Each structure stands twice: as C-alpha cells, then as structure tokens.
C-alpha cells in the first residue's frame, strides 16, 4: 500500500485515540480563525487528490466554517403571512447539506474561481469545517491540460449554486442503483411527473 492508502485508513478510524486528539486540537485551531480562509495546502491530501486536486499552480484550497443545526426562517418578528400550516419558523430543515452550503459560500467569495469539490475536515458541537477545492480557470496550467479543460467552459460557472458538485448532487437525490429510483429521469420532479401523468395512447 502507498502512503495515501495508509492515510485513508487513518481517517476512516476517527474514533481512534490519535484521530480524536488530532481532530479536537484542529477544531480548536479552526475556531480561532475566520469563518472563511485560504489554506496553503489540504489537510487531507489523499482525499483532495481523489476529488481531483493536484499540488500545482491553479489549484486553491479554502477552509469554511458552517454553523450546525437547522435553518431558522428569516422572517421579521415571525410574521410569515398566510395559512397556519405554513407558519413554521424554527423547526425548518434546509433542503441541502451543510457541505453544499460551504461550497456555495466559497464560490460567492471567490467569484473568479470554479468550485471543483469539497470534503469534511472536522466538527464540534457548534460548527462543521469543510475544505473546498477551487480552480483558477485562467491559469495556463489548467487551460492547457486536457484533463482539466472541461471546467474552464462557461457552462460550469457557479456549478456549486446549481447542485452540480458531488455534495449538490447528493442533496438532489441523484446517483446510480436502487437507492436512487426516485430521481430516474433527471430529478425528483421529473420522475414524479412521468409516473403520475396518465397517457392514453391512441390505438392504431
């Protein structure tokens, strides 16, 4: 096994004495920093490389701190205006994961970069911490490489806002296998519409 494989196994055993100590110390360190800051290199190089990161020019890592818990509806004095069934303010659950929220914040902050992917690096009782891989699409090392040219195209602008990253697709319920039958046809709505539309084909 290579070094990255050993590193992967270390991260799989998060309850081990070494990892529990490391994660506690790192969470303390991350809490002292701002909620969004650039890191010189990835905390988990094995995971970052599996997601497409390369230690060369054009790749940037940002660490994002996201507050845990549900999403309170932003309404003034709890006035939601409407039927009582829609009066909920506090117990509202956000449709997307905190990881996709972290990607969105990184994408907003670095408008000229493209979000490639992200991964978990730690959490405590209040926050979750993610590292987001961003790509500088105007760098020659990215534009001239056939493996990374795809992300330079205009169709991938703010892909994190449209649920096109790995975390975003997971929140949309997309994937392969029997677990994802609810989204056959592109989305939950498309699958529901197809299954609930009565089609009476003309007999010929």
UniProtKB/Swiss-Prot annotation:
GO terms for cellular component: cytosolic large ribosomal subunit. It comes from the Eukaryota. The lineage of its organism: Eukaryota, Metazoa, Chordata, Craniata, Vertebrata. Component of the large ribosomal subunit. Component of the large ribosomal subunit. The ribosome is a large ribonucleoprotein complex responsible for the synthesis of proteins in the cell. Its main location: cytoplasm. The gene is rpl15. The keyword Cytoplasm applies. Belongs to the eukaryotic ribosomal protein eL15 family. This is Large ribosomal subunit protein eL15. GO terms for biological process: cytoplasmic translation. It is found in: Cytoplasm. The keyword Disulfide bond does not apply. One of its GO terms (molecular function) is structural constituent of ribosome. It comes from Paramisgurnus dabryanus.
